[in-house]
Amino acid sequence: MEIEKRVVELTDRLQYIQDIFGGRENANIALMRSRLGEFAARADAPPGEKAQMLRQLEDLFGFLEKKLDAELSPMDRVRIVRHPGRVSLKDILENVYDNYTEIGGQDEYSIDPSMLIARAYITRRKGDKVINQPVMVIGQEKGHGQEFRNGGSVKPWGNAKALQYMKVAETERIPIHTYVFTPGAYPVEDFPGAAQQIARNLYEMGGLRVPVVSVISEGGSGGAEAIGLSDVRLMLSHGYYSVISPEGAAAIEAGIRQGQRVSPDLIEACAKRLNITAADNLRMGYIDKVVDEPDLGARPHHYDFFKDLRQEVVRATDQVFLGVAGFKLFRALVASRRKAEDAEGMFVRWTLDEAAADRLVWKRYCKYRRMAETAFRDSRPSGARIASRAQS
């Protein structure tokens, strides 16, 4: 039974690889398929010989997956984050946080299954004491019932629900962790309206007086921005973050009419020109750090990935608090020199006084103003630009 189970796992891995490469022929994929077929043809081999062949086959799969990971195109990464086997927010809640309780909507904020809200806890030690630090977790859920959750496309009232609980977190003075898993907001203009609600979220998030840390896996257009304006932006290494989907960009580029289809080659070209990968976004300054994933993207059984993600979100939250709170130079040096794998080695209290909250809002304003300056070409005369900078 153990051998059969491992063979099924290899078959699933091969199918996953074929899915993310979009049916493209590849010598490495062909070799994996061939060797798996050869193993299946030796079903009557002695158990000892089969076990040895299976170990060799698993080693081959691991080696070739690493090679294939280096060959991924931007569109391949898009297919990775859209794959139903991709990690989802519920997987993260189960494996990154020590405890959580999902929260529904209320009053005029009707429940939108694609927007998941949870009160979660990070358990840390301070000497002999065990301290549970609360966090408000907000994000799009596209797995665990994809049709029911509309593929992560949030309706306006779902984004309104997210904003409501951001304000709750601000009232309770607890940090917010947002997880972006959306191809884009659902295009419905019923009240309060998709664009209007996204704008409302952005306006309110800019003034939140608690730290916000976001993790981006699939960041599609305005749907990502509805919960993505944060003090620290982390991005998964196989994710994408773009102003428009590659298919949408290709449709505009080709000027297609209703009923027509865009060629796959044009979609691939648009995905490359959009600069949507984690490396592209880090280079352009739209994110702060890339969180490494296993080869060919993180899936629910990659428990080491969840451990690394926990370290990164805890470290990012600590850095936001330490960056605005009053603390001694020695403590700052200790915090900056902590080992990369030991983010929880030094306890940081997640509380801010009013002066620190003011500094937090100001730093967030400066962060996004700088980002806007690099993305917008100012055509005003140099004198007007200098005067504007002096006033700010």
What are these language model-derived features?
Residues 166, 273-280, 368-377:
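A short, hydrophobic secondary-structure junction motif
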Residues 1-134, 142-144, 307-392:
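Intrinsically disordered, low-complexity segments enriched in small/flexible residues
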Residues 50-53, 158-160, 262-263:
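Short, motif-level signal for alpha-helix interfacial/capping segments enriched in acidic residues
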Residues 2-15, 19, 180-328:
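Conserved catalytic cores of soluble enzyme domains
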Residues 66-67, 174, 238:
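A generic hydrophobic-helix recognition signal that picks specific residues
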